[in-house]
From Swiss-Prot:
Gene Ontology molecular function terms on file: acetylcholine receptor inhibitor activity; toxin activity
Protein name according to UniProt: Alpha-conotoxin VnIB
Expression by tissue: Expressed by the venom duct.
Organism: Conus ventricosus (Mediterranean cone)
Keyword check for Secreted: yes
Domain of life the protein comes from: Eukaryota
Description of its domains: The cysteine framework is I (CC-C-C). Alpha4/6 pattern.
Function as written in the Swiss-Prot or TrEMBL entry: Alpha-conotoxins act on postsynaptic membranes, they bind to the nicotinic acetylcholine receptors (nAChR) and thus inhibit them. This toxin potently and selectively inhibits human and rat alpha-6-beta-4/CHRNA6-CHRNB4 nAChR (IC(50)=12 nM on rat nAChR). It exhibits rapid binding and unbinding at this receptor.
Residues carrying Glycine amide: G39
Length: 42
């Protein structure tokens, strides 16, 4: 039962984290610089 809960938690966490990296990360200069998905260097 605990394995199932962990898997479900991981699945639910993955989507918001991915969205946060795409949106929020690109708003932070340090993360923006390291993330090519944000559009590369300015």
């Amino acid at each position: 039962a605990s394995d199932g809960r962990n898997a479900a938690a991981d699945d639910k966490a993955s989507d918001p984290i991915a969205l946060t990296v795409r949106g929020g990360c690109c708003s932070h200069p340090v993360c923006y610089t390291k993330n090519p998905n944000c559009g590369g260097r300015r």
